[in-house]
């Protein structure tokens, strides 16, 4: 009997563009991209493949359309969905009062609240919103409506499929005040709360 495992995968989909831009993106973000499948919607160039192999990134070349959560819904569509499904289940919230250790990985469809620290080498991936009230040194991938961070010492942060740039991460490092990250269209908004 054939032994198989089913896995859910988070992916970055890259459309045809200049190889130099793709290589720059891969070089800059290779540490964070270790956690994703990179899907190229075209036959990639040999120099791009060399960068992918150099950093041991997992990738796929395909011309096939892939289904997924990349579809943008307008506010009108969202309101219509709410009207048509009043009993829609909201994600639950999970609270972690302990520290998340190096090497620990948490994958969740819930909203997550961390009262302790997230150590370097830990990885958090959540379909819901994430709040971290301790020191954050690990990788965070948040697909929720918001991301709340207090003391950040990590450059490995992804919010709604966007890897935070060095400039955005520097805004988080300024002080230990609580900051909330939201997204309006394609623009990240980082606000200091306290």
Curated annotation (Swiss-Prot):
<dbReference type="InterPro" id="IPR013033">
    <property type="entry name" value="MinC"/>
</dbReference>
<keyword id="KW-0131">Cell cycle</keyword>
<comment type="subunit">
    <text>Interacts with MinD and FtsZ.</text>
</comment>
<dbReference type="InterPro" id="IPR016098">
    <property type="entry name" value="CAP/MinC_C"/>
</dbReference>
<comment type="similarity">
    <text>Belongs to the MinC family.</text>
</comment>
<keyword id="KW-0132">Cell division</keyword>
<dbReference type="InterPro" id="IPR005526">
    <property type="entry name" value="Septum_form_inhib_MinC_C"/>
</dbReference>
<dbReference type="Pfam" id="PF03775">
    <property type="entry name" value="MinC_C"/>
</dbReference>
<dbReference type="GO" id="GO:0000902">
    <property type="term" value="P:cell morphogenesis"/>
</dbReference>
<dbReference type="GO" id="GO:1901891">
    <property type="term" value="P:regulation of cell septum assembly"/>
</dbReference>
<keyword id="KW-0717">Septation</keyword>
<dbReference type="InterPro" id="IPR036145">
    <property type="entry name" value="MinC_C_sf"/>
</dbReference>
<dbReference type="GO" id="GO:0000917">
    <property type="term" value="P:division septum assembly"/>
</dbReference>
<protein>
    <recommendedName>
        <fullName>Probable septum site-determining protein MinC</fullName>
    </recommendedName>
</protein>
<comment type="function">
    <text>Cell division inhibitor that blocks the formation of polar Z ring septums. Rapidly oscillates between the poles of the cell to destabilize FtsZ filaments that have formed before they mature into polar Z rings. Prevents FtsZ polymerization.</text>
</comment>
């Amino acid at each position: 009997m054939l032994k198989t495992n089913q896995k859910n995968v988070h992916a970055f989909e890259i459309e045809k563009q200049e190889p130099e831009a793709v290589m720059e993106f891969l070089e800059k973000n290779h540490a964070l991209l270790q956690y994703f499948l990179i899907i190229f919607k075209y036959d990639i160039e040999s120099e791009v493949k060399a960068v992918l192999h150099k950093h041991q990134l997992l990738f796929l070349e395909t011309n096939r359309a892939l289904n997924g959560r990349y579809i943008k819904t307008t506010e009108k569509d969202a309101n219509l969905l709410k009207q048509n499904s009043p009993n829609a289940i909201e994600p639950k919230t999970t609270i972690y009062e302990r520290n998340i250790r190096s090497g620990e990985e948490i994958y969740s469809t819930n909203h997550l609240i961390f009262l302790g620290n997230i150590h370097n080498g830990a990885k958090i991936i959540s379909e819901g919103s994430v709040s971290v009230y301790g020191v954050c040194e690990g990788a965070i991938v948040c697909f929720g409506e918001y991301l709340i961070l207090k003391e950040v010492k990590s450059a490995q942060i992804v919010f709604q499929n966007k890897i935070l740039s060095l400039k955005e991460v520097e805004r988080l490092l300024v002080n230990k005040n609580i900051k909330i990250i939201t997204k309006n269209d394609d623009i990240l908004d980082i606000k200091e709360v306290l």
